[in-house]
């Protein structure tokens, strides 16, 4: 158990401590992925190449980290209905390989199975063997509660601390069937947690008439809002490459931070835009929820 900090020695120390808390709460941190025309990460760009806006008003960039070393908390969410897929072994092996590659000192990962219910198979840990074992034991499920899964994953990440990067990786066929939560609740929960979402859609058929295109479009909207990326592998053999791409992107992210001017009202959604000079593709979360004043 963490030992609580001793009380401040005097009133000046107490005031300084309160000031630090206010500064930490007010800082808006924005993880930003910058890709070149070949969809490769673009590292080593200078601070001067970036502009950040809130509600259309340019903000002063107070924090700039290239290839941020901020530790990761990752929620790996696997659609249990994929367990019936004839090539499930490839999917499990790709996810297992990703777990072994992505975790660095200080990082933590949790595995969730999404069926009619959402089950956290392993809580956040750096125990690679436990995590890989859980991926290989995803049970077959009847329903698919994707929105419930996103909401639960977001809530677990929201309480993991603001000094860490929060990431959800969802592997699914996009066939939402049994959630209690709806689209709006899932998106709001994701925004509140400040998480990035990477969605990998395993399509049982390529023809649109046999796919859940409405589910795919809903996930595209949430993923774009959260600043992540969608992937549609044509074969499960492509999964290794997709997981490697996500890993590279997470290791080459820029972390930007600013203190909003003017500050928005309490508990309201504020839009964010990041611009980078040059011919680049830029991804970042599009909005955040203000805290209490």
Regions found by a protein language model. Give the residues of each.
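Scaffold/interface architecture of coatomer-like assemblies
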Residues: 1-293
